[in-house]
């Protein structure tokens, strides 16, 4: 059915048929609007492709400079491993292990016999999610999100903390069930989830992405495992993305973040609004970004984890903090 009036349609309703001139103007106006929309869509698609190529080129250049570009993944890997070349081939710092209250990585990890009989067992912290959960953009293990949080929790609780990361660069929220299988095998005491950006890349509807996140959180909380989820950051602060695409992605990311936060809380987890609490601090501060100008740098991850850490400690204590409490407590927690 056409949305442009026709002579027959007007006559059938008993209305006066518009003149040929009026109909022509309306038709041409409609065509003009459609042409304008098509042009805008093509512009956005072109910007997306251009920005992606630029980010990938910078990532490869940085990896070559650091000596972290490695051969492709082993053939036969899971479908989730078939990612963009520069993501698959970049070797990330490794930080899984047991951390003491003074921040030392115990290597090798202590055996049960090495732990005093009256000492509490190590807490197990598991990281799930996408490239932000595994610290894509960092240059040393000390900058990894999981390591920062493990050391912070160990210092705050005066206990050993075992950190395991099952996140995957390029993962979408639909990958969480696979990650959960690995996570549950670790018998975690607390889980951190950072995910959502790749759902935007693949145009997964925000409500669907949030629902999948809520399901993952519910799977954990039903087992008595506390969960802290950092919601999607504001893509509007990433200047490597040109306008008007950046504004479009900003609105999408904020909508996704709001739905994620609601889903996490309804599932019994703690949601930390990174778009509100952290993203503004990236504006005008290029040192917060990695050399691909897209992912956070070590400093950027440090700022984000400073906001997440108080939420972890509160969840372990069976308490909840507000966003204001998180900001106020973060520096003290990290310097403890």
Feature annotation, model-predicted:
Residues 180, 213-217, 257:
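Generic structural signal for well-ordered alpha-helices
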Residues 236-336:
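Catalytic His-Asp segment of secreted/periplasmic serine-dependent ester chemistry enzymes
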Residues 223-225:
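A short helix->loop->beta-strand "cap" motif at the edges of active sites that frequently abuts
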Residues 194, 230-231:
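Alpha/beta-hydrolase-fold catalytic nucleophile elbow
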Residues 1-124, 313-315, 321-336:
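N-terminal secretory targeting modules
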Residues 128-129, 230:
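Short hydrophobic segments within beta-strands
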Residues 165-167, 231, 273-276:
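Residue-level recognition of beta-strand->loop/alpha-helix junctions
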Residues 124-126, 132-211:
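Conserved SGNH/GDSL esterase-like catalytic core that processes O-acyl groups on lipids
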């Amino acid at each position: 059915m056409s949305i442009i009036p026709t002579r027959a349609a007007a006559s059938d309703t008993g209305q006066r048929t518009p003149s040929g001139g009026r109909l022509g103007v309306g038709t041409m106006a409609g065509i003009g609007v459609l042409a304008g929309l098509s042009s805008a869509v093509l512009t956005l698609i072109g910007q997306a492709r251009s920005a992606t190529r630029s980010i990938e080129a910078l990532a490869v250049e940085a990896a070559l400079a650091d000596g972290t570009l490695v051969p492709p993944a082993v053939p036969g890997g899971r479908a989730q491993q078939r990612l963009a070349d520069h993501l698959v081939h970049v070797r990330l710092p490794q930080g899984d292990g047991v951390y003491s209250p003074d921040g030392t990585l115990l290597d090798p990890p202590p055996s049960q016999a090495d732990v005093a009989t009256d000492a509490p067992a190590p807490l197990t912290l598991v990281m799930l999610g996408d490239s932000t959960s595994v610290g894509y953009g960092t240059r040393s293990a000390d900058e990894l999100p999981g390591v920062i949080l493990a050391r912070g929790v160990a210092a705050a609780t005066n206990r050993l903390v075992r950190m395991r990361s099952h996140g995957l660069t390029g993962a979408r929220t639909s990958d969480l069930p696979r990650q959960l299988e690995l996570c549950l095998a670790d018998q975690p005491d607390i889980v951190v989830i950072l995910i959502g950006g790749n759902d935007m890349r693949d145009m997964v509807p925000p409500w669907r992405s949030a629902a999948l996140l809520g399901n993952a959180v519910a799977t954990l909380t039903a087992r008595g495992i506390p969960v802290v989820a950092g919601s999607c950051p504001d893509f509007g602060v990433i200047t490597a993305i040109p306008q008007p695409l950046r504004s479009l992605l900003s609105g999408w990311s904020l909508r996704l973040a709001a739905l994620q936060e609601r889903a996490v809380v309804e599932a019994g987890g703690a949601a930390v609004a990174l778009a509100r609490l952290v993203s503004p601090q990236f504006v005008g501060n290029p040192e917060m970004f990695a050399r691909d100008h897209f992912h956070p740098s070590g400093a950027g991850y440090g700022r984000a984890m400073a906001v997440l850490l108080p939420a972890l400690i509160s969840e372990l204590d069976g308490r909840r903090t507000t966003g204001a409490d998180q900001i106020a407590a973060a520096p003290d927690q990290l310097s403890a």
